Amino acid sequence: MGTPGSGRKRTPVKDRFSAEDEALSNIAREAEARLAAKRAARAEARDIRMRELERQQRESSSKDITGTHWSRASTPKRRDMMYDSIKDRSSRVSSLLDEKSDKQYAENYTRPSSRNSASATTPLSGNSSRRGSGDTSSLIDPDTSLSELRESLSEVEEKYKKAMVSNAQLDNEKNNLIYQVDTLKDVIEEQEEQMAEFYRENEEKSKELERQKHMCSVLQHKMDELKEGLRQRDELIEKHGLVIIPESTPNGDVNHEPVVGAITAVSQEAAQVLESAGEGPLDVRLRKLAEEKDELLSQIRKLKLQLEEERQKCSRNDGMSGDLAGLQNGSDLQFIEMQRDANRQISEYKFKLSKAEQDIATLEQSISRLEGQVLRYKTAAENAEKIEDELKAEKRKLQRELRTAQDKIEEMEMTNSHLAKRLEKMKANRTALLAQQ
């Protein structure tokens, strides 16, 4: 065999690839170390941001404690849920960034090895210097990608900080708006309750007005009937020539209230007789007339006795007149005079007696009529009192039922408003949970 020709001595392929692999492994280890350091820095920054957000949230909650006292029990839950959501978002963002950076690192650091493995399968040539320059350019690319990743990561972190701050501000504004909405809902509920109360009072007043109108129409109808009755009474009085005598205060009682319609219709003769009896109540005048009647009857009886005595005397005198004709010429004239006087008195007494009997008959008729009217008035008054007692009892019963019904309605309205408020709070909590999820 001949000696090999002169030229550059080639390095063994195994040694060259082992050096490249070692360099690549060193670079990969350094990149992994830098990536782990970045991950630790990101975790520390995330913890710092979370503490800052918690501090801002505590400050905002301490400022808005007067406005959000009504949701004191649900605020920690919402805060925890918000922090959990923020942590989940930050963890998702960091995981996405880590995956992206890992993929970029893996792509950047696996490409040279793939190239080297491909070049290892090809036959060796004299352009190893060019391959070496290509390998160095592929080794420089990860640094540029790392700087770009750092810049993009810093931008993303700034945006994330701004988003967290704006999210906290928006959450505070949302809580304030929720409190204002709840306050306005309470005001609206109070106004609705007031409007319902006003409507109820209006309905009651309208019903009372309708009742008053009905009573007014009934009273107007009764008044028309009474006017018609008065007109017919006046016509009958004028037709029969009667006279209306109003009754005075009974039994001389000055404080007694005058009775409405306490009048009596009598004939003109009876009216004249009652006027002759003097003034005063009708029963007093009737009592006076009865006393006068008794006196007249007693006088008539006395006169009848005197008349019988005179007749007996006359009969005795007639028997003795034959014997004493001459003696009694002077006394006959006196007897005739006395007889004429007696006859005149008897005729006068008879006339008075007949007149008194007529007056007594008319007064008895008026008394019987008045007694009938009194009985009718008494029965009507008793019936009216019974009806009034029944109506009062029914009114008290209806008032009790109305009070019980109003109490039940108020209780039901209170329970309804309470349930409506609870329903609104549950709806608000549900919407808040859905918005946070």
Swiss-Prot record:
Record's compositionally biased regions (Polar residues): 63-74, 110-139
Biased composition range(s): Basic and acidic residues: 33-62, 77-105
Modified sites of kind Phosphoserine: S18, S114, S117, S125, S129, S133, S137, S138
UniProt signal peptide: none
One example of a Gene Ontology biological process annotation: Wnt signaling pathway
Keyword line: Coiled coil, Phosphoprotein, Wnt signaling pathway
Superkingdom of the organism of origin: Eukaryota
Residue span of region Disordered: 33-152
Assembly and oligomerization: Interacts with DVL3 and FLII. Weakly interacts with MYD88 in resting cells. Following LPS-stimulation, the interaction with MYD88 is rapidly enhanced; the complex gradually dissociates to basal levels after 6 hours of stimulation. Interaction with MYD88 is regulated by LPS-induced phosphorylation. In the presence of LPS, competes with FLII for MYD88-binding.
Function: May function as activator of the canonical Wnt signaling pathway, in association with DVL3, upstream of CTNNB1/beta-catenin. Positively regulates Toll-like receptor (TLR) signaling in response to agonist probably by competing with the negative FLII regulator for MYD88-binding.
Protein name according to UniProt: Leucine-rich repeat flightless-interacting protein 2
The organism of origin for this protein: Rattus norvegicus (Rat)
Lineage of the organism: Eukaryota, Metazoa, Chordata, Craniata, Vertebrata
Gene that specifies this protein: Lrrfip2
